[in-house]
UniProtKB/Swiss-Prot annotation:
Top EC group: oxidoreductase
InterPro entries in alphabetical order: LytB/IspH
Its biological purpose: Catalyzes the conversion of 1-hydroxy-2-methyl-2-(E)-butenyl 4-diphosphate (HMBPP) into a mixture of isopentenyl diphosphate (IPP) and dimethylallyl diphosphate (DMAPP). Acts in the terminal step of the DOXP/MEP pathway for isoprenoid precursor biosynthesis.
GO molecular function: 4 iron, 4 sulfur cluster binding; 4-hydroxy-3-methylbut-2-enyl diphosphate reductase activity; metal ion binding
Positions of isopentenyl diphosphate binding: H96, H185, S317, S318, N319, S380
Protein name as catalogued: 4-hydroxy-3-methylbut-2-enyl diphosphate reductase
GO terms classed as biological process: dimethylallyl diphosphate biosynthetic process; isopentenyl diphosphate biosynthetic process, methylerythritol 4-phosphate pathway; terpenoid biosynthetic process
Active site: E187 (proton donor)
Record field: catalytic activity: isopentenyl diphosphate + 2 oxidized [2Fe-2S]-[ferredoxin] + H2O = (2E)-4-hydroxy-3-methylbut-2-enyl diphosphate + 2 reduced [2Fe-2S]-[ferredoxin] + 2 H(+); dimethylallyl diphosphate + 2 oxidized [2Fe-2S]-[ferredoxin] + H2O = (2E)-4-hydroxy-3-methylbut-2-enyl diphosphate + 2 reduced [2Fe-2S]-[ferredoxin] + 2 H(+)
Keyword annotations: 4Fe-4S, Iron, Iron-sulfur, Isoprene biosynthesis, Metal-binding, Oxidoreductase
Pathway the protein takes part in: Isoprenoid biosynthesis; dimethylallyl diphosphate biosynthesis; dimethylallyl diphosphate from (2E)-4-hydroxy-3-methylbutenyl diphosphate: step 1/1; Isoprenoid biosynthesis; isopentenyl diphosphate biosynthesis via DXP pathway; isopentenyl diphosphate from 1-deoxy-D-xylulose 5-phosphate: step 6/6
Length: 398
């Protein structure tokens, strides 16, 4: 499929909307009423610090809702107000935040069900309204919904769309897209649907593995078994890794994405020489500004004198997980929670998710005496949720 031609055609349809329905002023006001917090505003104004009794809170200087998330959430809410009586569906979670998604359910927005990773669109009918989430949707899903005669409300983050343009450029010039991401993640599934040949690498270790194969130091069967679910149909590593371009899932760790780009640039330079590099490697710049800002702020926060650190965001949120990774590199006692309800004031306990593990209970997690607590949140976490967490910490400390 010519994905660029399809998207151009879709954008000109009178059943497609990517701008929303409210004015920017009204949209900002609605979000402020729903999700902003006076406490968080005052902490920002006070240099991102707050002291109450023995508790000293230090907030990251960039955290919480990013512009793309604010836009997606606002458009989803506007859609229900604009279509008060129609069936409204959403192809996935609007963002990785349980409270926001629960609010959509209360507004009678229906979530497309999936079984074994396959979505069931059979209940979606002509004239229904379908919201595409901030992560985007696959081009196949868009085509299906368009052919069904649905009204499509596209809240895809513009930074995600930018990555789609990048992989389409790779396809046009017959380069394989190497996508730094999680192959099951909604955003990467969408991005790969716009690519031609592609391979998804999770981290630097996998990138180095692919590099070794390109340089002739790998086993084909082992390679294909390793990446069986993370490559395009008919992928041939002996042919499809001769010309590569790098792209990324926008929520991945910025420093790792940059290093993966350097790995493949060095690999192609070594194999084909400097005079042929541009024919075998395409440079990239698809790192999301908001992701970069939050990760940079986290690196600054973990350099502070902290006793513990609380990371707030959905457990399936990639950008939140990477914030947790940064804390771990500094050996700070850190706790990833998705809602304030994970903290028990009465028990001084926290039900949290260690990186790569199942949820576990930590009793007496807030130490006695003076304590410095660092706090950050993922791009899908409203300020009000952060404020509720701080209030619980204050209650425990007092």
């Amino acid at each position: 499929m010519d994905t660029q031609a399809f998207r151009r055609s879709l954008h000109h349809s009178d059943r497609y909307n990517r701008r929303g329905f409210d004015s920017p002023t009204k949209r900002a006001q609605a979000l402020e009423e729903a999700y902003q917090s006076d406490l968080i505003s005052s902490i920002r104004d006070n240099g991102f610090t707050y002291t109450k009794g023995r508790l000293n809170i230090k907030l990251a200087q960039a955290f919480g809702f990013c512009w793309g998330v604010e836009r997606a959430v606002a458009m989803a809410y506007e859609t229900r107000r604009h279509y008060p009586n129609e069936n409204i569906w959403i192809t996935n979670e609007i963002i990785h935040n349980p409270s926001v998604n629960d609010h959509l359910r209360k507004m009678n927005v229906k979530f497309i069900s999936a079984k074994n990773g396959i979505k069931d669109f059979s209940l979606v009918s002509n004239g229904d309204v379908v919201i595409l989430p901030a992560f985007g949707a696959t081009v196949q899903e868009m085509k299906l919904l368009h052919e069904k005669g649905c009204h499509i409300i596209d809240t895809t983050c513009p930074w995600v769309s930018k990555v789609w343009h990048t992989v389409e450029k790779h396809k046009k010039h017959v380069f394989t897209s190497i996508i730094h991401g999680k192959f099951k993640h909604e955003e990467t599934l969408a991005t790969s649907s716009f690519a031609g040949k592609y391979l998804v690498v999770l981290d630097l270790e996998e990138a180095n593995y692919v590099s070794e194969y390109i340089l002739g130091r790998g086993n084909r069967n082992e390679f294909m078994n390793k990446f069986a679910k993370a490559c395009s149909n008919g992928f041939d590593p002996d042919k499809d890794l001769e010309r590569v371009g790098v792209a990324n899932q926008t929520t991945m760790l910025k420093s790792e994405t940059e290093e993966i780009g350097k790995v493949f640039e060095r690999t192609m330079l070594k194999k084909f020489g400097p005079e042929n590099l541009n024919s075998h490697f395409l440079a990239f710049n698809t790192i999301c500004d908001a992701t970069e800002e939050r990760q940079d702020a986290m690196f600054s926060l973990v350099d502070e004198d902290l006793d513990i650190l609380v990371v707030i965001g959905g457990f399936n949120s990639s950008n939140t997980t990477h914030l947790q990774e940064i804390a771990i590199t500094k050996n700070i006692s850190s706790f990833h929670i998705d809602t304030p309800e994970r903290i028990s004031v009465k028990e001084n306990s926290i039900f949290h998710k260690p990186l790569g593990s199942e949820l576990e209970l930590k009793n007496n997690f807030l130490p006695s005496g003076k304590i410095n607590v660092g706090i950050t949140s993922g791009a899908s976490t409203p300020d009000k949720v952060v404020a509720d967490v701080i209030e619980k910490l204050i209650d425990i400390a007092s």
